[in-house]
């Protein structure tokens, strides 16, 4: 069993190795590291626009065809450099299982690997966090909210589940102590977050490998909210969603159709543009 204090490592962080660095969630974390002058190394199966952009910004990325079996290769030397260091962290995406050769290498050499969600939790602990959750709509809402905050004078940071057309990135940097994150229910990843505001956009049965029944998923959302009770200033729910929190005072609903605490009115002109109020 590997005993480690990841929080202490994070405080002194100098380098990170990302297994599955080309994934949309992991690559955003890599961009944050690069912005904060932390050395970034990583692996993915093939080169993509995402991995090429990371390399352009300073990351060292290795691909599947670069064999680990070749002694003293650059990749092998990088992996060795993470052994016994108290200022480095290895992060893996949810797509990487425990039998992946790089994860196995680190396990054999007693190097602790942590999930993407745990690393995001470590980062977000230094911010006031707005967590966007729900089985559908997280990326759209997170991106819209980030842009609204930016143009409204709040220079927030954000980790998005897609590439924003406004910012050409899945990581949006900001100088204010506000962060927008997608709170992913898959594999109960959102349990690593400690948000100040939680929005739940939808609740449908999904991820049957994690939640055998809808009630299991609903219970996870309940736990996500309750574990953060001390931090929460408000909870925002889509109207008529199949979950409620009567035990909390600051719970608000939003809707496009009908009345709610937050509602949206929009008009479409002849050019196809919308006016929203």
Where are these regions (language model features)?
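Phosphate-binding loop of NTP-binding sites
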Residues: 4-9, 18, 32-35, 56, ...
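Short coil/loop residues immediately preceding or within conserved phosphate-binding loops
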Residues: 13, 127-129, 273
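Glycine-rich adenosine-cofactor-binding loop
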Residues: 17-30
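Short N-terminal binding/cap micro-motifs at the start of the first secondary-structure element
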Residues: 25-28, 49, 166-167
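NAD(P)-binding Rossmann-fold cofactor-contacting core
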Residues: 39-53, 156
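General small-molecule cofactor/ligand-binding pocket signal
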Residues: 41, 60-62, 114, 252-255
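Short, conserved SAM-binding/catalytic segment
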Residues: 53-60
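Acidic-glycine-rich active-site phosphate/pyrophosphate-binding loop
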Residues: 260-277
């Amino acid at each position: 069993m590997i005993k480690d204090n990841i929080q202490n490592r994070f405080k002194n962080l100098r380098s990170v190795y990302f297994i599955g660095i080309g994934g949309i969630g992991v690559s955003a974390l890599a961009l944050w590291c690069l912005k904060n002058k932390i050395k970034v190394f990583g692996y993915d199966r093939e080169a993509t626009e995402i991995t090429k952009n990371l390399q352009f910004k300073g990351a060292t990325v290795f691909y599947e065809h670069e064999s680990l079996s070749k002694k003293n290769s650059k990749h092998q030397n990088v992996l060795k450099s993470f052994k016994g260091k108290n200022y480095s962290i290895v992060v893996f995406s949810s797509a990487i299982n425990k039998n992946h050769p790089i994860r196995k290498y680190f396990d054999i050499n007693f190097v602790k690997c942590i999930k993407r969600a745990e690393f995001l939790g470590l980062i977000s602990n230094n911010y006031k966090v707005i967590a966007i959750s729900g089985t559908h709509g997280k990326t759209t809402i997170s991106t819209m909210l980030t842009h609204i905050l930016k143009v409204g004078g709040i220079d927030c940071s954000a980790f998005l589940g897609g590439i924003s057309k406004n910012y050409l990135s899945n990581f949006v940097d900001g100088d204010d102590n506000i962060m927008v994150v997608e709170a992913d229910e898959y594999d109960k990843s959102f349990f690593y977050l400690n948000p100040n505001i939680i929005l739940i956009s939808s609740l449908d049965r999904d991820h049957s490998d994690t939640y055998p029944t809808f009630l299991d998923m609903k219970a996870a959302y309940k736990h996500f909210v309750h574990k953060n009770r001390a931090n929460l200033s408000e909870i925002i729910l889509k109207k008529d969603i199949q979950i409620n929190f009567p035990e909390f005072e600051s719970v608000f609903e939003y809707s496009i159709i009908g009345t709610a605490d937050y509602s949206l009115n929009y008009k479409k002109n002849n050019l196809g543009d919308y006016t929203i109020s």
